[in-house]
From Swiss-Prot:
WD repeat residue intervals: 35-40, 132-169, 178-214, 230-266, 271-308, 417-452
Quaternary structure and interacting proteins, as annotated: Interacts with snoRNA U3. Interacts with MPP10. Component of the ribosomal small subunit (SSU) processome composed of at least 40 protein subunits and snoRNA U3. In the absence of snoRNA3, forms a complex with other t-UTPs. This complex can associate with pre-18S ribosomal RNAs.
Main function: Involved in nucleolar processing of pre-18S ribosomal RNA. Required for optimal pre-ribosomal RNA transcription by RNA polymerase I together with a subset of U3 proteins required for transcription (t-UTPs).
Xref: PANTHER family: U3 SMALL NUCLEOLAR RNA-ASSOCIATED PROTEIN 4 HOMOLOG
Major location category of this protein: nucleus
Pfam families: WD40 (PF00400)
Species of provenance: Saccharomyces cerevisiae (strain ATCC 204508 / S288c)
Coiled coil: none
Name used for this protein in its record: U3 small nucleolar RNA-associated protein 4
Length: 776
């Protein structure tokens, strides 16, 4: 019988129909789809953005270029701009924490350093290898509102609410923050900071003034306030200078304030050159390009304005003009940043809308732009238990569990059976539920807790299980081997087995891991050699690392053996025990299937030698739907009835592939072309070690699908079936109907649970600025 899809339940934003009566159809397969929209996960507001490198249009994009995204729940996300952007790491926040400023330090020969501030007197340096704080430095000068780094990357300046600007020396290397000096104090909060080289600090303050301090070493004016410039006064309230940047080419300062004005100041004489009343509300952020030919501003009115400088050589005084603006956001824009190189041209913005918007910097007015999905589940916060038909979701410090019914006679056939709120400050990093649905493991960066779930009536009774070992163990990833044994990967990358029912549960069985060779990239980006995926099936486990290393673990013998070495970031891993293979997806959405043989020595074998025949035939021959994907694959699972049929899913799509069949090859080939629309890295630098990246030919594939829509009026269920045809034989399916997706998995052989979030529910309680309607 051929495969086809899907019998879709009638969509309701808050309700769920669970069961459809089986319909007998010749040469067709019926599958019930549960569109689960009851999971109330909402991502946090984007509060800050920072690129790890300075722009340089004369060089190729460095392999270690990263974007840090700070959110209002204290999380920091690290993104790689390659392969249409993908998330590499999440640093978990905590209760009542927020990231209000981010700053990178990039010094040759040293690893990247990341600093953050967030509503306290502390500057935090993060350990990028573990995701834990490396150093918390208290500046002892009030709550910090702003942070900036000098050109030499050896000093931080932080602005406080008591009017103090503190300079911190970071030249000692990772983890070393030392007090340098305190600049002359004034009364107003320092809302924003910028440097002119290493010699001057520029601050925007809450009294409507821009101040310039001297930071020159061995100068008699060191620490003194040199100049003060005042912006326009608001009628009813004091003006706030939210953002300032320095423009080296013209020796100017650009400022944005709460009146909606953008002003350009002469640095040398501290005088106003030009002023634009462009925005209808507060200007919250500014950025510029490499050559300072453009300045971009954004804020509460949701618009991004571009200011261009008139470079007419016949004019002595080059003037700034308001050249264009675009309305791309649905709410306040809190942060904006830019990066340029030979192969990169990014203008990135984000805010209350919670999603990232990527523009082309040089063709801003009429170029392409991309709005990322609001949810990108690289780090998943949902799981599905098949045996008990449970859906588990966790966010910040709360775990919620729903049960899904089997009777379609009720309008709302799901129920919240458990809500667990932890008292600890740290956000939950991962959870795992035993196959029988009775034991829940909750992991965080500092501790791990175990709970027993017992059905009592229509609820689940939660009982905490004591385990001193786990209480002092940090957990990054955790999976169940069976109903009592778990495999844990700690934040320090130790992998060990714990038997929860054993009397010796305080003695973990550590698995011996292979050493990973250090590379130029792993020295610069410490987490690149760390474990990012852990998959377990019976007594076999597979781990993958950010650098593309895949190892297979024998949990009985507690040893590991190499499986594959890929030159790309791995976004999803799956063990297929029936086929005795491991399926891996990389950031460029290539599917690799490796033979899984614990008895063979693979140290001297290359990745190609362990590829299955299917992978050799099809890895570079995937359908055009896969080749043009913008969102990465983040999940894989096998079909229950036929393990050769694998399901793949990303934030906005679902696909199924039959691994028993090869894709047809069209001999007609197109010329090489890029499909990234200029919004990702396009030069020849590579993900690892700056090696050249060979682009694959674009192969035409024609996978025909005949979709017949049947409407069952009696049950009010809309179903979609894919008819069998001789060419495709139903071996490939692809849909982008469901979005954005939090999680996808099978509940039974003919039931598919799609955990999606209605985009309308993402809107913040904070009302967006209302733009006047256009009247023609």
């Amino acid at each position: 019988m051929s495969s086809s899809l899907l019998s879709v339940l009638k969509e309701k934003s808050r309700s769920l129909k669970i069961r459809n009566k089986p319909v007998k159809m010749t040469s067709q397969e019926r599958m019930i789809v549960h569109r689960c929209r009851f999971v109330d996960f909402t991502p946090a507001t984007i509060t800050s953005l920072a690129f790890s490198h300075k722009s340089n249009i004369n060089k190729l994009t460095p392999s270690d270029l990263r974007l840090a995204i700070g959110r209002s729940n204290g999380n920091i996300e690290i993104w790689n701009p390659r392969n249409n952007w993908f998330q590499e790491m999440v640093i978990e926040g905590g209760k009542d924490r927020s990231i209000e400023g981010l700053c990178w330090s990039n010094v040759n020969g040293e690893s990247l350093r990341l600093f953050s501030i967030g509503g306290s007197t502390v500057v935090t340096e993060w350990d990028l290898a573990t995701g834990l704080p490396l150093r918390n430095y208290d500046c002892n000068s009030g709550v910090i509102w702003s942070i900036s780094i000098n050109d030499s990357q050896d000093k931080l300046s932080v602005g406080c609410d008591n009017g103090t600007v503190v300079l911190i020396d970071i030249s000692g290397g990772p983890g070393v923050l030392e007090h340098d000096t305190i600049l002359m104090r004034q009364e107003a909060r320092v809302l924003t900071l910028a440097w002119k080289k290493d010699d001057f600090v520029i601050g925007g303050c809450s009294d409507g003034r821009i101040r310039i301090w001297s930071a020159q070493k061995n100068d008699e004016n060191m620490g003194r306030l040199l100049h003060t410039m005042k912006v326009d006064k608001a009628k009813k309230e004091s003006t706030l200078v939210w953002s300032v940047i320095y423009l080296p080419r013209t020796d100017q300062i650009a400022s944005g304030d709460s009146t909606g004005s953008i002003k350009f100041w002469d640095f040398q004489f501290a005088t106003l050159n030009q002023s634009f009343k462009a925005h209808d509300a507060d200007v919250l952020c500014l950025t510029t390009d490499t050559d300072n030919n453009y300045v971009f501003s954004a804020g509460v009115d949701r618009k991004i304005f571009q200011f261009s400088q008139n470079t007419n050589k016949s004019q002595k005084n080059n003037r700034w003009v308001n050249s264009s603006n675009r309305l791309l956001h649905g709410n306040d824009i809190r942060a904006i940043c830019a990066y340029q190189s030979k192969g990169a041209d990014f203008l990135v913005s984000g805010g209350v809308e919670k999603t990232l918007v990527i523009n082309s910097l040089t063709s801003f007015s009429n170029g392409n732009y991309r709005k990322m999905p609001t949810v990108e589940p690289y780090s998943k916060n949902v799981l599905v238990n098949k045996e008990q038909r449970l859906v588990v979701s966790w966010s910040e410090s709360t775990v919620k569990i729903w049960t899904m019914g089997t009777d379609s006679s009720t309008e709302q056939n799901y129920k919240l059976v458990c809500k667990l709120t932890l008292k600890d400050d740290q956000n939950i990093s991962t959870c795992s539920l035993s196959p029988d649905g009775q034991v829940l493991v909750v992991g965080r960066p500092s501790t791990t807790k175990v709970f027993h779930l017992q059905p009592v009536g229509n609820k689940l009774k939660v009982t905490k299980l004591d385990n001193d070992l786990l209480l002092r163990t940090s957990t990054k990833l955790v999976k169940f081997i069976d109903n009592s044994k778990i495999v844990i990967c700690s934040c320090e990358d130790d992998v060990f087995i714990v038997d929860l029912e054993s009397e010796e549960d305080e003695k973990p069985q550590e698995v011996e891991l292979l050493e990973v060779t250090s590379t130029k990239s792993s020295i610069k980006v410490p987490y690149i050699n760390r474990i990012n995926h852990l998959e377990v099936d019976q007594n076999i486990a597979v781990i993958s690392r950010g650098c593309g290393v895949v190892d297979i673990l024998d949990l009985k013998a507690r040893i590991s053996k190499p499986l594959a070495r890929l030159n790309n970031f791995i976004t999803a891993v799956h063990i297929n025990t029936s086929r005795k293979s491991v399926v891996v997806i990389t950031a460029d959405n290539k599917i690799y299937e490796f033979n899984m043989n614990l008895n063979s020595e693979a140290e001297n074998e290359d990745s190609e030698s362990v590829l299955t025949q299917w992978s050799k035939n099809n890895t570079d021959n995937l359908p055009k739907e896969w080749k043009t994907l913008k969102e990465n694959c983040v999940g894989i699972f096998s079909d229950i009835e036929n393990s050769s049929r694998l399901w793949f899913w990303g934030a906005t799509w679902i696909s199924r592939i039959d691994f028993d069949v090869d894709f047809p090859i069209n001999k007609r080939r197109k010329q090489k072309k890029r499909t990234h629309e200029g919004l990702t890295i396009t030069d020849e630098s590579n993900f690892m070690n700056d090696e050249e990246d060979d682009e694959d030919d674009d192969i035409d594939m024609e996978i025909s699908e005949n979709l017949n829509v049947l409407l069952n009026q009696g049950n009010k269920i809309k179903s979609t079936d894919v008819q069998r045809n001789e060419e495709s034989s139903g071996h490939f399916f692809f849909t982008d109907k469901y979005k954005p997706l939090l999680f996808v998995d099978l509940i039974s052989s003919n039931e598919l649970a799609i955990i999606e979030r209605n985009p309308l529910t993402f809107h913040s309680k904070q009302k967006a600025f209302i733009q006047p309607k256009l009247v023609f």
